[in-house]
Amino acid sequence: METGRIIKLISGVYQVDVDGTLYDTKPRGLFRKKKFSPIVGDIVDFEIQNTSEGYIHHVHERHNELKRPPVSNIDGLIIVMSAVEPDFSTQLLDRFLVIAHSYDLEPSILVTKKDLASENEIEQINAWLKIYEEIGYNTQFVGKHTSQQEVVATWPKGLIVLSGQSGVGKSTFINAFKPELNLETNHISKSLNRGKHTTRHVELFERESGFIADTPGFSALDFGHIDKDELKHYFIEMNRFGEECKFRNCNHIKEPKCHVKQQLENGYLAQFRYDHYIQLYNEISNRKVRY
C-alpha cells in the first residue's frame, strides 16, 4: 500500500503523486456505497496494480475543504485580483474573503497588472490595500516586471490555492513561476470585460515547497452555506470589535450599544467594509429557503 496526494481528477481517474511519481488510480466500490468521493488535495492510501495504476482504499481525514472548486488540505489561499481588465473591486474581494473564512482558510491578497494601471488607479489600490493590511491580511501588488519567484517565496509552504475571477492572471502567474507548465491563459472579453474561462478543472502542480493549484475562475460566488447570523464572524475586524458589544448576538445593524457601529463612527472601521457586510447580510436574509 502506498500513500500520496491526489493532484488531478479527469473522467473518474484520480492522478496521485508519491514523491514525484504519478499513478492513475480509481476509488474502490465502497466509496460509492458510502456516497463519498475523493477530491483533489486528498491524502490517500492506494494499492498499486500494473506499475503505474492502482485502486484507492482509504482517504485520510481532511483538515479543511473548499467546496467550489473542490480542493482539500489547503495550507494557504491566495485571492488574485487585477488592478484593471477586470477592474479591482473591493466588493468582490470582500466576498472572496468571506468565502475563505467560512471554510476556515487563511487568505492572502495578490493584485496583478500593476503595470497596466494609471497612477491614480495605483494610488487608490494602494490605499485600499493599506486598509486590508491594517485588518491583518498579507497583500502583494505586482506587475509584469515583478519577480514572481520572489513573490511565491513569501507564500506558506504546502498546498497553495490561487482563487479569483477569470482574466486576473492566475494561469499567467503560474506560467511565469514554472514556464514548463504552459497553462492556457485567459483573454478579456471586450463586451463583458470578463475573462474567458480556460482553466476548466482543478489541478495541482508541484513547487519547491509543496503544490500550487490553478482553479477554475469564478463568475459567481455561492453563500448558500452561510447563515446571516454567522456572517459577522467572517469580517474579521468586525468580529474583534463585536466582542465588546452589549449583546452577544449583536449583528451590528440596529442593535443598541453596538461597539462595531461606534468604531465605524470613530473611523476605526472602513465604511466600504461595513457597507459590503450590510449588503451581503441583506442578500443572505432575503434568499429563498432551499428544500
UniProtKB/Swiss-Prot annotation:
InterPro entries xref list: G_CP_dom, NA-bd_OB-fold, P-loop_NTPase, Ribosome_biogen_GTPase_RsgA, RsgA_GTPase_dom, RsgA_N
Keywords: Cytoplasm, GTP-binding, Hydrolase, Metal-binding, Nucleotide-binding, Ribosome biogenesis, RNA-binding, rRNA-binding, Zinc
Binding sites annotated in the UniProt record for GTP: T112, K113, K114, D115, G164, Q165, S166, G167, V168, G169, K170, S171, T172
Role this protein plays: One of several proteins that assist in the late maturation steps of the functional core of the 30S ribosomal subunit. Helps release RbfA from mature subunits. May play a role in the assembly of ribosomal proteins into the subunit. Circularly permuted GTPase that catalyzes slow GTP hydrolysis, GTPase activity is stimulated by the 30S ribosomal subunit.
Keyword flag Magnesium: no
HAMAP family: GTPase_RsgA
Protein name: Small ribosomal subunit biogenesis GTPase RsgA
A Gene Ontology biological process term: ribosomal small subunit biogenesis
Sequence similarity: Belongs to the TRAFAC class YlqF/YawG GTPase family. RsgA subfamily.
Protein location: Cytoplasm
GO function term, MF aspect, one: metal ion binding
Pfam families, per database record: RsgA_GTPase, RsgA_N
A single Gene Ontology CC term: cytoplasm
SUPFAM superfamilies (UniProt xref): Nucleic acid-binding proteins, P-loop containing nucleoside triphosphate hydrolases
Superkingdom of origin organism: Bacteria
Residues holding Zn(2+): C245, C250, H252, C258
EC number: 3.6.1.-
PROSITE patterns on file: ENGC_GTPASE, G_CP
Assembly and interaction partners: Monomer. Associates with 30S ribosomal subunit, binds 16S rRNA.
Predominant cellular place of this UniProt entry's protein: cytoplasm
Cofactor(s), names only, from the UniProt record: Zn(2+)
Manner of cofactor binding, per the entry note: Binds 1 zinc ion per subunit.
Domain CP-type G: 63-221
EC class: hydrolase
